[in-house]
């Protein structure tokens, strides 16, 4: 890795249909083997399902991401032969990335017909503060709380 210049983050363009960067990030997160059109179809299918249930899909999606974004996490840190789980605050970009990753992961684990259906159900659950994604966030917060004593090892 070169030490000369700082790497500039690329700006993700907004999604053409909903004009939202967050939706485009989710499409990229769902995509497998470069099949973006399939991922787009899954997302839009999930949004259509949410709309059929009488709710605004973009609002539900944004609420689901907001509810499942962690504020703190633990990172392993070696100090004198012992490894401590040190609680660290999560930067906003990383928090959103983790939330999207968890939403996709727990959607894939659900039993159901199509991925669009499973994603719609997971998004609805996360928006209502239930489901596996929210449980994962709570678990992460509990781990950080339990290891609060090691917060002075922060780096």
UniProtKB/Swiss-Prot annotation:
SUPFAM superfamilies associated with the record? Ribosomal protein S7 (SSF47973)
Q: What does this protein do?
A: One of the primary rRNA binding proteins, it binds directly to 16S rRNA where it nucleates assembly of the head domain of the 30S subunit. Is located at the subunit interface close to the decoding center, probably blocks exit of the E-site tRNA.
Complex and partners: Part of the 30S ribosomal subunit. Contacts proteins S9 and S11.
Q: In the record, what terms sit under GO molecular function?
A: rRNA binding; structural constituent of ribosome; tRNA binding
Recite the UniProt keywords alphabetically. Ribonucleoprotein, Ribosomal protein, RNA-binding, rRNA-binding, tRNA-binding
For this record, the Gene Ontology CC terms, alphabetical, are: small ribosomal subunit
NCBIfam families reported for this sequence: rpsG_bact
Pfam families on file:
Ribosomal_S7
Task: State the encoding gene.
Answer: rpsG
Q: Does the keyword Ribosomal protein apply?
A: yes
Origin species, per record, is Cyanothece sp. (strain PCC 7425 / ATCC 29141)
Q: What is this protein called?
A: Small ribosomal subunit protein uS7
Q: Which GO terms describe its biological process?
A: translation
Q: Which family does it belong to?
A: Belongs to the universal ribosomal protein uS7 family.
């Amino acid at each position: 890795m070169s030490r000369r210049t700082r790497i500039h983050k690329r700006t993700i363009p907004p999604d053409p249909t909903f004009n939202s960067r967050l939706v485009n990030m989710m499409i990229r997160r769902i995509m497998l083997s470069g099949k973006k059109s399939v991922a787009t179809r899954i997302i839009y299918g999930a949004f259509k399902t949410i709309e059929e249930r009488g709710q605004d899909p973009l609002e539900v999606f944004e609420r689901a991401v907001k509810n499942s974004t962690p504020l703190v996490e633990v990172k392993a840190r070696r100090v004198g032969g012992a490894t401590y789980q040190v609680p660290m605050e999560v930067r906003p970009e990383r928090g959103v990335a983790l939330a999207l990753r968890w939403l996709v992961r727990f959607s894939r684990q659900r039993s159901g017909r199509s991925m669009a259906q499973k994603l719609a159900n997971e998004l609805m659950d996360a928006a209502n503060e239930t489901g596996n994604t929210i449980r994962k966030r709570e678990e992460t917060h509990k781990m950080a709380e339990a290891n609060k004593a090691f917060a002075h090892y922060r780096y």
